[in-house]
Amino acid sequence: MASPAVSLVCYDLASLVIDAAVVERAFAEAIATQGIVTGTEAYVRSMVRFDRARGRPPADILHDLFGSDESRVQAASLAFDRSFNSAAERFGVTASPETLCALGKVAAAGIRLCLLTSLSRGASGAVLDAITRDVQAELVLCADEVPRGFPWPDPVLTAMLRLGAADVRETAVVSATENGLLSGYRSGAGLVIGVDESRQRIPAMRDAGATVVLDDIAALPELLTAAS
């Protein structure tokens, strides 16, 4: 049986729109409120853990870090939200012209678009408001609006259900992180598309379930058209 045409794109904002360095800085500032500061072994271990978990919700990483100490988890999560919002206000978070052009072509082809983020609504609300002024998305899902975030399949499956995808294979998932790609793979999406401009993480992305890896987001519309 032939695969159905792509009718839905789930686009992970991590790294593709939301700068990974901004998220990392906010995470470092969040754990500093709990006594884990630059120059300590605990800080180095925590940042290594963060780097290896890139793409997962920061709240989940903080749970891993602080375990059952829920008060520290909650305090650090609130600090992360404040720090990220402050950084977004100072430096701005906008989609590149190439990304806007690519997503515009996707929409023009009649393909529905869902934006996914591993951040909470509290952290990313202002950023999402700015992005959706330029990007015509039918749905935006944050990490705290699904049962489980990346790398679980819940974000992608939730998008499929809410937008009425008749077949999981009609969905394409686009991500620049291995955890986002793993979510797409676990959901059964027909296309799992990695984006790696450096071309240094292609093997890791393949291992995470990517069916194809692009080095330029501008190639996305043509890929989706060919798959259809």
Regions found by a protein language model. Give the residues of each.
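A broad detector of the eukaryotic-type serine/threonine protein kinase catalytic domain
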Residues: G67, N85, E89, I111, ...
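Active-site phosphate/pyrophosphate-handling residues
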Residues: V22, D60, C101, G122, ...
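N-terminal helical cap/lid subdomain that shapes the substrate entry/recognition surface
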Residues: S3-P97
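Asp-based, Mg2+/Mn2+-dependent phosphohydrolase catalytic module
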Residues: M1-L8, G104, S120-S228
